[in-house]
Design a protein with these regions (language model features):
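Amphipathic alpha-helical segments typified by the pilin-like N-terminal helix
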Residues: 1-15, 21-23
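Periplasmic/extracellular, small/polar-rich flexible segments of pilin-like filament-forming proteins
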Residues: 29-133
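Short, well-ordered helical secondary-structure segments
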Residues: 15-16, 21, 41, 88
C-alpha cells in the first residue's frame, strides 16, 4: 500500500476515535455515565467503513470507556481511545481524562483493555503508543 494512501486511511480512524473520545466526555458531563454504543453518542459516525470497524467497550464499573478503530485492511494501524474518570483528591468532584493511542505495528487484532489509574496519566494498552496532539 502506498504511504500516502495508508496515511489517509489511518487519518480516518484517528479522527473517528478522537471524535468518539470527545463525545464520550460530553456525554458523561450531561448524563454522569458513558455511552455504551456509537449511536448513543449521536455524532454520525458509522460503525463500519471500508477501512475500519469501530466499537465501544464500557467497563463494568463505568470508570472508563474505550473506543476502538480496528483495521480491516492489511498494513493499517489500529487506534484506541480511552476516557477515564479522575476523582479530585481535594474534593469529591469527578472529571474525565482522555488519551488517543495508536498500535505500534499494523494489526487486525483488538487492543487490550486499559488499566485505569486515579491519576491523569492514562496508559495506552500494551503494543500501543500515545498519539501526540
Amino acid at each position: 500500500m502506498q504511504d500516502q494512501q495508508k496515511l489517509a486511511r489511518q487519518s480516518e480512524a484517528k479522527q473517528y476515535v478522537s471524535s468518539m473520545n470527545r463525545a464520550q466526555q460530553a456525554f458523561y458531563a450531561e448524563y454522569a455515565s458513558f455511552a455504551s454504543t456509537i449511536q448513543k453518542l449521536g455524532i454520525g459516525i458509522k460503525s463500519e467503513t471500508e477501512n475500519y470497524s469501530y466499537s465501544i467497550v464500557l467497563s463494568n464499573d463505568n470508570r472508563w470507556v474505550q473506543a476502538i478503530g480496528l483495521a480491516k485492511r492489511d498494513g493499517l494501524k489500529n487506534y484506541t481511545g480511552i476516557v477515564s474518570l479522575i476523582k479530585s483528591p481535594n474534593d469529591e468532584s469527578t472529571s474525565t481524562q482522555s488519551r488517543l493511542c495508536e498500535s505500534n505495528q499494523p494489526s487486525k487484532e483488538l487492543p487490550g483493555t486499559p488499566t485505569p489509574t486515579n491519576s491523569p496519566d492514562i496508559q495506552c494498552p500494551s503494543g500501543y503508543s500515545d498519539v501526540l496532539k
